[in-house]
Amino acid sequence: MRILLSNDDGYLAPGLAALYEALRPLAEVMVMAPEQNCSGASNSLTLSRPLSVSRSATTGFYYVNGTPTDSVHVALTGMLDAKPDLVVSGINNGQNMGDDTLYSGTVAAATEGIMFGVPAIAFSLVHKEWAHLEDAARVAAEIVRHYLDHPLPGQPLLNVNIPNLPYGELRGWRVTRLGKRHPSQPVIRQINPRGEPIYWIGAAGDALDASEGTDFHATAAGYVSITPLQLDLTHTQMLAATRDWAHAGSGAS
C-alpha cells in the first residue's frame, strides 16, 4: 500500500509529523507538503511562477514553495511512478467543519487527490492546540487502516474532525453532514507605519447550524466526525427553478 501525505500547515508542522509516524506501520508513505503555512489557501494552484521541490535533510519530507493543492498536484503528476492507494491530508491545527471546508487548504489537498482519481481523507484536530495530538494521530491511523482494509466504493473524499480529547474520552465515530457558520467577523482595519490602511481578515463566525447530525454537534459531544464530501457543486434542487427562470428570461428578450 502507498499513501501520499500532505497538509496545509507546512512541512515542519507537528500535525504532519505525528500523522506520518502513525501511518508508517500501515503503508509506504511519501510526504509532499507546502514549504510555508498555507491555511485558508483553499484549492488554489500557483500559475504565475515555476515551483521548486526540496527535501528536508532531517525528516526526508518533500516540500514545495506553493500551496497544498500544488503539493499534491506535483507529487501525483510529476514525481510518483505509480498512483498511490490513498491521499491523506493533515493533521490540521484547528477544525475544518461546516463552511470551513470551502477555505481549507487541508481539505483542498485531499480534494486534489480526488481530481486524479485517488481516494482521499482530510484530518483536522478541533481547537488550535496540540494537547492531544498523539491521540488524534492514533485515531487517524485507525480510520486509514479501516479504509485500506475495507475500501468504500468509488473515490471517496472524507473530511474527518477529531475532538481535542484524550483517546479514552473519545466516544467513537459519527458520520455527519456539514454544519453552517455565521458570516465571519468584519475585517480589522489598521494603519501601517507609512500611514496607509491595512486589513486583517476577521475571526470565523460562530456555528449557525450545529444541530444533531452535523459535524459541529458530533465533535462537541466527543465523537469523531466523518463527513463524505463531493466535488460536484451543482445545486440539483435548484435546477428546475433555474430552468424556468432562464426560459422566462430568454423568452422575454
From Swiss-Prot:
Cellular component, GO annotation: cytoplasm
Pfam families in UniProt: SurE
Subcellular location: Cytoplasm
InterPro entries documented for this protein: SurE, SurE-like_Pase/nucleotidase, SurE-like_sf
Domain of life: Bacteria
Cofactor field: a divalent metal cation
Keywords assigned by UniProt, alphabetized: Cytoplasm, Hydrolase, Metal-binding, Nucleotide-binding
MF (Gene Ontology): 3'-nucleotidase activity; 5'-nucleotidase activity; exopolyphosphatase activity; metal ion binding; nucleotide binding
Main location (coarse class): cytoplasm
Enzyme category, top tier: hydrolase
Protein EC: 3.1.3.5
Cofactor note: Binds 1 divalent metal cation per subunit.
Residue sites binding a divalent metal cation per the record: 8-9, 39, 92
Catalyzed reactions per annotation: a ribonucleoside 5'-phosphate + H2O = a ribonucleoside + phosphate
Coiled-coil residue windows: none
Role, per record: Nucleotidase that shows phosphatase activity on nucleoside 5'-monophosphates.
Family per record: Belongs to the SurE nucleotidase family.
Stored PANTHER family: 5'-NUCLEOTIDASE SURE, 5'_3'-NUCLEOTIDASE SURE
Full protein name: 5'-nucleotidase SurE
Organism the protein comes from: Burkholderia thailandensis (strain ATCC 700388 / DSM 13276 / CCUG 48851 / CIP 106301 / E264)
